[in-house]
Amino acid sequence: MAMILVTSQKIREAAENLGQLNRQFKGKTEELTTREQALCQMWEGQAKNAFHGAFERDSRQMEAFHGLVNKYVQVLLEIAQRYEQAEARNAEIAGGRSY
């Protein structure tokens, strides 16, 4: 059976990487919104309204995704912190043992 070793530092690195990617995602969605607004100013009719409605729905989904990824990053950081606290307690207990 394969063994996977994870350290709190690796969890923190993964959280930071994911956070950075999520910030890039947010920037791209903001760029898309700006372009969609500019496009809507040049366009009229039912097709414009349909496109704008679809974009608004997609935009809400992208925002929800961004929020969920942010929450996941926070959970990863909390996991790393709890692991470090447990590790410190265990080291203290082990160091205090005498025979």
Stretches with model-predicted labels:
Residues 1-99:
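Amphipathic alpha-helical hairpins/coiled-coils and adjacent low-complexity
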